[in-house]
Amino acid sequence: MEARTVHTRKTLLWAGAALTASAAVFFPRVQGIRDTDDSWWRLATFFVPQDREGLVLVPLVILLTIALFGVVGRWAWEDSSARNRPAKVGFVCALLGVVGVLAFFVSAPIIFGGLGATLGVEGRRRRDTEGRGALAAAAIAVGAAAFAVGAAIWVFAEELSI
């Protein structure tokens, strides 16, 4: 039974990483389509770089997101001391997502907000045995807000004159 629980945990972590990496590439592509009046059908291939800048940035953003989830996320997830490390680390990452708005051009609020929310979900799952349920809920809320603000900046960058 323990092996299944560990597998479920890892599945949630990597699902969060995949969703976050996809969003970190998707929303800038939406902004690019709106900026150049391209066809919305181009979103079907949002992972495919459209220019030389994209050839560098798309793989870089994906690799950095996976590395962040792999290092920080796994470290927080594998808390053996029953202190609900995912809740604490998730909240810190969510706050970094809010501050990351200053670095929106590398999708920092989306990446850190996604990691914070993912770790917050794991923290909420552990709250009955390890405590810190409120901190986990805050990680989810702040992480989701940072994620949403990062996405909104990309989608509405032109209207915001960014």
Task: Place the predicted regions along the sequence by residue.
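Hydrophobic transmembrane helix segments
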Residues: L19-L64
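Short juxtamembrane and helix-loop transition motifs at transmembrane-helix boundaries
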Residues: F46-D51, L64-S80, V99-V101, F156
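Alpha-helical transmembrane segments and their helix-start/interface "positive-inside/aromatic belt" motifs
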Residues: A3-A18, A134-V142
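Cytoplasmic membrane-interface segments at the C-terminal ends of transmembrane helices
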Residues: T5, L68-P86, T118-A138
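Alpha-helical transmembrane segments
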Residues: L12-A24, F91-L96, G143-A146
